[in-house]
Amino acid sequence: VIQEIFGVNGHIRSVADGYAAQGYSVIAPQLYDRSAPDIELGYTQEDVQKGRDIRVELGFDKPLLDLQAAVSLLKSEGLAVGIVGYCYGGALAWRSAAKLEGLSATVGYYGSAATFKDEAPQCPVLLHYGEKDAMIPSTDGAMLVDLYPNRVEAFVYPADHGFNCDQRASYDGPSAALALERSLFFFQDYLG
């Protein structure tokens, strides 16, 4: 499970616990430990800015080292490995699908995957977008499906950015439930 810009906070731990309850072995790497060890941010404007600052400092390359280590650990246990990421983690999920060894499936929620559209995914990818999202255009999904029709599926929900996070005002329960259902079916198909 790949974090948003807020670090591995209560929401991400809850997501990880949810996948574990479905029978998956789960790792939620603390990607910000390279810059701000053990940081856990909330959803205030101050925390949003702090998270963005750390994301800018780390970029989109350094976290791939930690994600590869997590994937390799799970692969060493004989497991098929999938990644799910949210926002910043959604973009990292896309990059992981293109760059990491050992992935069988990737899911990204409202991430800026289109920024890295020239990096072709090496495993199946499922993307979730909110049509009311002012930060990440929901049309990105269709564009990525057009570029990689045999690798990418995308869905758009009547929701805003962060619709999966039940700790934010943008939470949309029905959209979150449907996206999770689709993600679980997707992982079942590719991970078992």
How should these model regions be labeled?
Residues 1-192:
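N-terminal cap/leader regions of alpha/beta-hydrolase-fold enzymes
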